[in-house]
Amino acid sequence: MWIFYFPAVISVLIVSLYFYFTRTFNYWKKRNVRGPEPTVFFGNLKDSALPRKNMGVVMEELYNMFPEEKVIGIYRMTSPCLLVRDLEVIKHIMIKDFEVFSDRGVEFSKEGLGSNLFHADGETWRALRNRFTPIFTSGKPKNMFYLMHEGADNFIDHVSAECEKNQEFEVHSLLQTYTMSTIAACAFGISYDSIGDKVKALDIVDKIISEPSYAIELDMMYPGLLSKLNLSIFPTAVKNFFKSLVDNIVAQRNGKPSGRNDFMDLILELRQLGEVTSNKYGSSASSLEITDEVICAQAFVFYIAGYETSATTMAYMIYQLALSPDIQNKLIAEVDEVLKANDGKVTYDTVKEMKYMNKAFDETLRMYSIVEPLQRKATRDYKIPGTDVVIEKDTIVLISPRGIHYDPKYYDNPKQFNPDRFDAEEVGKRHPCAYLPFGLGQRNCIGMRFGRLQSLLCITKILSKFRIEPSKNTDRNLQVEPHRGLIGPKGGIRVNVVPRKLVS
């Protein structure tokens, strides 16, 4: 008899699932917030979830759908989220009313690598920030410059040797060898002479991290579930690798600074100071002991921030220089002039003083903002100034730097590579929130000084020896890799790297 009821049971199940996965889809309509129609199971992130498109590209497309709206109501699977377009509203969220949006809202187990400065929220983040932010102030990367310089020289020697065999390179993976070795030296004190095996190990870690993460997809579908189940988004193999690496370094240095002035030295100096405390907000202070686990988590995020983002940004800059010979000529002239004035040496100060180089780097970051989208979580109900829209507590707020950076309201001909956009006069005309490659406010990218320095040093060294030219395999219409969390080139970037003495 049951067979006669089977179709009815299936029908009820399908209808129940439909209503379950669409139960929130009137949330924004009830609040008179416009947005695209969501689809069952996926909300507005179908292309990202499958994955057919990178999350940053999806957010840019959503941004462009409603050009007259200040905010757009969207759904991350079934969860209502708010995509903010208006720059003044962004300024309130990131700066003026930061205490309401101080959390990123990335919820998973904070054990192990989860207690890092990027992902931590609440009092844990404040405690970490109070103690660890000084590590990334301008003076600290300057002290590491000698390590970066040694790495850049080794990298140029490697490229020169490879050029004798073949002048065409896939520059994204090529530049990863530079940033990985530099991070290994600046973060973990691994000398360039003994770097081979460690870099191979870090390369394996990168491949594990870059694989599609089902944990992240699960968090998108059911926000907060990973935290409730005490699950991490980081594979156990990655956690074990960094724990072993940090344990060995701490043991080699007897738990004390070694005098190298690298990242581990700075953290060991902080550990000698005792607990990390936070009392910026509220009347009660919280504390966090700097354990080996906390050190491991910060070492991990330093590696992630300095390795992939810098390599990708440099690869995109190299790509644009290959397609823009006039701009490349100006940069080479500036590099030659600086080297001539400094006896052929590249110093910390000369890197910062090269105005056109810095403008070209800023323009690269405008066109290719690597971390997309920016995310915050409301810690209480918040009424958006100048509107009737109330962001309820725990709502995720998203910002699309890519959408803003390609908005013709803020940048003429936004698809054109034009470093002159960053003349001081032009920058002064723009809203401060029209440029967000590093985020903004207290939760901006604290590693931006380090990343910028190692990138500009490397590009300077490259242009002092080589010209960049399109190869027969250079893709004139680069696509974004859909499977990685960061913005990156699908299929890599192929160009010719030609020794300048061979250029007619």
From Swiss-Prot:
PROSITE patterns: CYTOCHROME_P450. It is found in: Endoplasmic reticulum membrane; Microsome membrane. Pfam families: p450. The keyword DNA damage does not apply. Its EC number is 1.14.14.1. Disulfide bonds: none annotated. Its cofactor is heme. It comes from the Eukaryota. One of its GO terms (molecular function) is iron ion binding. One of its GO terms (cellular component) is endoplasmic reticulum membrane. Transmembrane segments: none annotated. It is a peripheral membrane protein. Keywords: Endoplasmic reticulum, Heme, Iron, Membrane, Metal-binding, Microsome, Monooxygenase, Oxidoreductase. Heme binds at C445. It catalyses: an organic molecule + reduced [NADPH--hemoprotein reductase] + O2 = an alcohol + oxidized [NADPH--hemoprotein reductase] + H2O + H(+). Belongs to the cytochrome P450 family. This is Cytochrome P450 6B6. It comes from Helicoverpa armigera (Cotton bollworm). The gene is CYP6B6.
